[in-house]
Amino acid sequence: MLCISVEEFLFWKKKQLSKGGDQPSFDFLLDCIGGISSSDLNLKSLNPNEDIHLKKNLEFLGSVWDDHLLKSCPIQYLCGITFWRDLKLKVTKKVLIPRPETELIVDIVFNIFRKKSEKLFFAELGTG
């Protein structure tokens, strides 16, 4: 595990984000590969003299971020996982990444059919 000061890490993070990309994708990378969640990072940021413990070094994390930016590859493919509802799913480039809108559709269907007494079965066909 790599130990780095919060101050040094925040400087590195700002430099990475200045290359492009969006904050949620970068946070996803840090959580999945770096081993630090955005909420933990926010707490650590309150005290720049503290240290952050990462699963991977900054050079590796930066190279994954560069791949994301240069190849326009979804961060979920590079991390090898994605989240859908309460599931953590393994993904590769051979599968489609679940869309956030699908979670919303499931919530709407559950709300409509929640009061039905009969047991209902649904299938999402993942037609892309």
Regions found by a protein language model. Name each.
Residues 63-128:
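SAM-dependent Rossmann-like transferase core, predominantly class I methyltransferases
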Residues 1-79:
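N-terminal auxiliary segments of SAM/dcSAM-dependent transferases
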